[in-house]
Amino acid sequence: MALPLAWALDLCFGEPRSAWHPVAWMGSSLAPVGRLLLRCSAGWAFFGGALAWLVGAAAIALGASALQSHLIELSPWFGAPLLAVVLKPMFAWRMLRDEVAGVEAALGASVEAGRAQLARIVSRDVTVLDAQGVRETAIESLAENLNDSFVAPLFWYAVAGLPGAAVYRFANTLDAMWGYRGRWEWAGKWSAHADDVLSWVPARLTAMLLRPCLRWRYWQLLRNEARHTPSPNGGWPMGAMALRLGVRLRKPGFYTLNAAAPSPSADHVAQALRFATHAAWVAVVLAMLATAARANWS
C-alpha cells in the first residue's frame, strides 16, 4: 500500500519544502565535505570521495532499513501511510512534469522567459540557446530525469525496499554535486561511476517504457544513438524520446541524437509530456507488482 499512497502524494502535492526534504538534507550535509575534497591532491580527493560515498550510503541504508522495519511492524492503517510519507521524497514526477511544461509556457512569452524557466531544471548554460535549443534541452531533461528522479528510485524500491530507493537517491544526488570533470575529476570519480552502475538497468528500462518495441533493429538503432552521449546511461532515455517523437535532440559541442530529424516544436513538447506520463504510470504499476512479488518471496 505504501507505493500507491506515495504516488498519490506526489500527484497531489509534489515536493515537500527543502527544509523537510531528505534529498536536500543529503546535499547540504555533504557540501562541506565536497569543499574539503577540492583542497586535496588527486589521490586523497579520490580516496575521500569514495569514503564519503561509502559511509553515507551505509548510514542511509541502515537508517532506512531500521525505519522501514519499524513501520512495517505497525498496523497497516498506520504503517503504510507513514512509509508512503517517507518514500515520497525518494522520487519526483509532478515537479518534473510541471517544470518542463512551464518551459513551453514561458517560451510563449519570450525566449528569455523560456531560458529562465529552463535554468530551473538544467545546469548547462542556457543563455546561448534559441527557442529550438530551449525545447530540445527541455525534452532531453524530461527524458533523462524521468529515469534519474522517477524510474530508477522505483526500480530500487522494488528491488530493495526503502533502503534501495534511499541509497539510489543518495548516489544520484552525490553524482549531481560531484560527478563532473575539471576540478571535481578525482573527488567525484567514485560517485560518478557508482551512479552509472546503479542507473544502468533503470535507464534501459526507461527507454523501453518511453517506446515499447520488441524489434531488434530498433534496439540496435537506439543503442547507436545512445553511444553519442558521454554518459553510458543518459543517452538511452533521451535517444528513445528522440526516436519516439521523430525529432533531433542535441547539446551543441557534445552530442546530437537522431541527427537527420527536424528540431522539436511546441507540439512535440506536449507529446513528450504525454509519453513520459504514460511511462510513469506504467513504471508505478510494474513497481507495485514487483514489490508485491518480493513481499511474497520473503
Question: Locations of the language-model features?
Answer:
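Hydrophobic alpha-helical transmembrane segments
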Residues: 1-166, 179-298
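Alpha-helical scaffolding flanking metal-ion-dependent phosphate/phosphodiester catalytic sites
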Residues: 168-177
